[in-house]
């Protein structure tokens, strides 16, 4: 519209100049009368403005035909929507449970009806979760006799529990609070634990517990959305950090597998003694540390309306079957099969004829492209090809059946009230309640300005050490993954003051090991407390470990200004080649 409006303004201004220079001709066209213009001239102006606006838009679009093809084949996550996400809490009927119940990855949760049509948004869990016959009854912060801060976790147990069938090697917990408190809790549990004690009802004194808390969300199996085999894990880690930091507010309680719990146990307590005192003004309770929580994402299976194709047309718009509600969008095309049982291979797999498989492969392939429509929705187009299309031998009655993954788009946040997730999709043997602990996020779309695709190609062609040249390069690299326009994310990036690196060597088991020591100077005022800084540093350390050359290790050191405090991370080794 801005191109069209600009052309219309130009034509109106040019018409006024023409009327002053040629009043007789202007009178014949009514150009000199602003309120009574000739309707045929108006239509001519509008048509010319539309055509020239389209031409100007094409000149300004930075040749997406070149960049989108390369980016979609090598790094498809840069072109995909990041759907709405949230964190849900399952509440089983734990007093009646005898053993854990596992909720598989992809378990569906529905929202209450929202919007004019009463649509229920469908969310799926991003990882499996074990519902234990436990309840976290109380979380209390107190001071020990020696002046140290102690966090007491009291778990209530089902007295029907068969402890031989319960695996307590890890118990995930979620820090359910605003960012400053959640980050402070996360830091206290993962970086500030001095010792742990266990107390059970029949014991007079508490006993030492060889346990600890570890940070969750950084593992290869912790991705929020489906990974493409072509995508580099480190890039997804950055996108997840900037778009849904709640994912990293999970911690894992470890060490209880060594404890022999007696039958009929009613409760047990764990005292977590902190190495440094809890100096924050805010307190927390069991409302802020939750059990049986898992992230969910607004993705669900769909089918497309059948497509009738011919060899003369290669692009087709896709529409979800029976879903014309004005908000459902297609996330991915998972499979394409023709009415003659011909399987179409994804073009990116290079398993079609002429690709890596040469002559022993499918004759057909498909590719997808996303374009933003006039309504604001992102529409998916299917592009088909192969030898049959090149030779025009596609059967006339050929139709395609497609399996899709869809999303509800912006509907979860368009409702006047916050969307509530409170219904499980599948029935289970036990009674389970569910609720969302945070408001569903808005979907994030790839940036469409500032030559984004060209910046992506420039970044992905750089080496690991080039990121460490200066603070501006690192800020620019991280900004490629900040799609939310969040003020807090902008402040975190601007807080990067300086970046230095130097080579380091050490001997390990008789071998010389080479690495890189990276020093990042941060302005502490750009973060919501020390816990926020530690989470940012952990993200950087993990990303550098994934991105670094395979023969190097890296060690991150963060220097805080204005205090000059140094935070050091353990050295990490690359386990795969980025790309």
Predicted regions located by residue number:
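Extended assembly-interface regions of large multimeric machines
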Residues: 1-203, 217
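Short linear motifs embedded in intrinsically disordered, proline/glycine-rich low-complexity segments
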Residues: 2-3, 10, 22, 47-58, ...
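Extracellular ectodomain segments of secreted/surface proteins
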Residues: 51-59, 77, 138-148, 154-167, ...
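Short, aromatic- and glycine-rich surface loops/edge beta-strands on solvent-exposed regions
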Residues: 110, 265-275, 398-405
């Amino acid at each position: 519209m801005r191109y069209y409006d600009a052309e219309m303004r130009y034509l109106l201004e040019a018409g006024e100049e023409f009327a002053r220079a040629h009043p007789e001709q202007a009178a014949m066209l009514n150009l000199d009368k602003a309120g009574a213009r000739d309707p045929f001239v108006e239509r001519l102006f509008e048509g010319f403005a539309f055509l020239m606006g389209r031409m100007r838009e094409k000149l300004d679009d930075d040749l997406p035909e070149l960049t989108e093809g390369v980016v979609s084949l090598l790094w498809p996550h840069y072109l995909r929507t990041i759907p709405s996400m949230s964190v849900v809490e399952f509440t089983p009927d734990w007093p009646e449970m005898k053993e854990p119940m596992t909720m598989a990855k992809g378990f569906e949760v529905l929202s209450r009806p929202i919007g004019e049509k009463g649509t229920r948004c469908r969310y799926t869990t991003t990882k499996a979760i074990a519902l234990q016959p436990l309840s976290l009854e109380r979380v209390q912060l107190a001071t020990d006799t020696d002046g140290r801060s102690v966090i007491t976790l009291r778990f209530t147990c089902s007295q029907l529990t068969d402890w031989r069938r319960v695996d307590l090697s890890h118990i995930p917990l979620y820090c359910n609070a605003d960012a400053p408190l959640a980050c402070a809790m996360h830091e206290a549990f993962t970086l500030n634990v001095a010792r742990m004690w266990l107390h059970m009802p029949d014991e007079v004194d508490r006993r030492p517990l060889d346990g600890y808390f570890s940070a969750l969300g950084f593992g290869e199996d912790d991705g929020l959305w489906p990974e493409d085999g072509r995508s580099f894990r480190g890039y997804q880690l950055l996108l997840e950090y900037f778009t849904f930091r709640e994912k990293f507010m999970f911690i894992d309680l470890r060490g209880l597998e060594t404890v022999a719990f007696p039958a009929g146990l009613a409760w047990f307590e764990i005292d977590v003694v902190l190495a440094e005192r809890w100096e924050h003004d805010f307190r927390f309770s069991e409302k802020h540390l939750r059990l049986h929580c898992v992230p969910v994402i607004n993705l669900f299976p769909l089918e497309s309306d059948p497509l009738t194709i011919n060899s003369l047309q290669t692009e087709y718009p896709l529409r979800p079957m029976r879903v014309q509600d004005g908000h459902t969008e297609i996330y991915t095309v998972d499979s394409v099969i023709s009415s003659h049982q011909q399987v179409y291979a994804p073009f990116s797999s290079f398993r079609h004829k002429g690709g890596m498989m040469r002559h022993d492969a499918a004759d057909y392939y498909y590719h997808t492209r996303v374009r933003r429509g006039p309504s604001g929705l992102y529409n998916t187009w299917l592009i088909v090809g192969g030898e049959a299309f090149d030779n025009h031998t596609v059967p006339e009655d050929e139709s395609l059946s497609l399996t899709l993954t869809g999303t509800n788009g912006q509907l979860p946040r368009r409702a006047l009230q916050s969307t509530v997730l409170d219904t499980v999709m599948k029935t289970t043997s036990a009674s389970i309640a569910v609720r969302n602990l945070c408001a569903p996020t808005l979907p994030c779309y790839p940036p469409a300005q500032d030559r984004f695709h060209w910046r992506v190609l420039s970044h992905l062609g750089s080496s690991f050490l080039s990121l460490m040249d200066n603070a501006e390069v690192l800020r620019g690299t991280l900004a490629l993954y900040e799609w939310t326009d969040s003020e807090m994310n902008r402040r975190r990036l601007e807080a990067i003051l300086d970046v230095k690196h130097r080579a380091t060597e050490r001997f390990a088991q008789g071998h010389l090991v080479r690495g890189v020591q990276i020093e990042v100077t941060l302005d502490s005022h750009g973060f919501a407390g020390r816990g926020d800084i530690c989470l940012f540093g952990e993200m950087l350390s993990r990303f550098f470990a994934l991105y670094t050359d395979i023969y190097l290790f890296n060690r991150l050191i963060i220097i805080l200004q204005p205090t000059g405090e140094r935070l050091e991370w353990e050295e990490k080794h690359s386990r795969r080649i980025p790309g």
